[in-house]
Amino acid sequence: MNEEFENFSIYGFSIDYPKECRVEFNPKSRRESGDVVFHFPERNKIFLSWGDLEKATKRFQTIEAHAENSLETVKKTGNVKNFEKVSSDTVNVRSHKAAYNHVRLEQMTAGFFTGRRAVPRDACSVHVHCPDSSRYFVIYALFPHESVEKQEKAIMAMTKSLKCH
């Protein structure tokens, strides 16, 4: 493990996360499904969610379909404009095929003094289906465009470190 990372482990899976992060575990999380947030000092966040693989595979024939559904959900939220897919790829996570996506969008924010304005953001996600643990995992983040390189690097390092079974 890189000295810039520490290990988070729970319910039989683990992931390395940047040491600078504060970890927030959702108290409603269970072995079957849940999420954890890794908070960066500059207020960016990377999320790790997991759930029942059987439920996911009933809804989605492929990992790509699961990932595409997540992108469509983001696209349809009322505060998103100018949604553009920057890249998509297949990556390997512990012998499992995983779907990686990077999108660019404008998030509409409302400020008391500034009114509604469009803030450029990037989002990255990795979807993994693990039959060995009967779970799916999603690593994702939404962050300011100027921090793309740092956040994408962190997400890919976390993805490579995920021990899903």
Regions found by a protein language model. Name each.
Residues 21, 133-165:
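Surface-exposed amphipathic alpha-helical segments
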Residues 68-130:
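Signature of long, low-cysteine stretches enriched in small and polar/charged residues
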Residues 8, 38, 91:
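Short aromatic-centered micro-motifs
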Residues 16-19, 41-43, 94-96, 128-136:
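Short, solvent-exposed coil/turn segments at beta-strand boundaries
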Residues 55, 107-108, 145-147:
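Solvent-exposed loop/turn segments at secondary-structure junctions
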Residues 11-74:
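Secretory pathway targeting signatures of secreted, lumenal, and periplasmic proteins
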Residues 1-6:
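N-terminal low-complexity, Pro/Thr/Ser-rich intrinsically disordered segments
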Residues 45, 118-122, 134-136:
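Short, mixed charged/polar active-site loops
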